[in-house]
């Protein structure tokens, strides 16, 4: 398994909710979590768990949704992780 954490300095909106709804249908995506900071509503995080690094790379290289997110949320960053253990 492979994971990445997407972080943006942006509050939740109808647009971000729609992005997440579209994202959940991505092939190869096993789990996705949308988080918002309790103390800072602009602290937005999405955690994506993929079946493989290749599945995540396919999404990152070719998805129109990724381009839409990057344009709408210019502060977005993605950090990549290998999943070592899970429950």
What are these regions (language model features)?
Residues 1-61, 71-87:
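Short S/T/G/P-rich N-terminal loop/turn motif that feeds into the first structured element of a domain
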Residues 65:
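Cell wall/extracellular polymer interaction/catalysis modules
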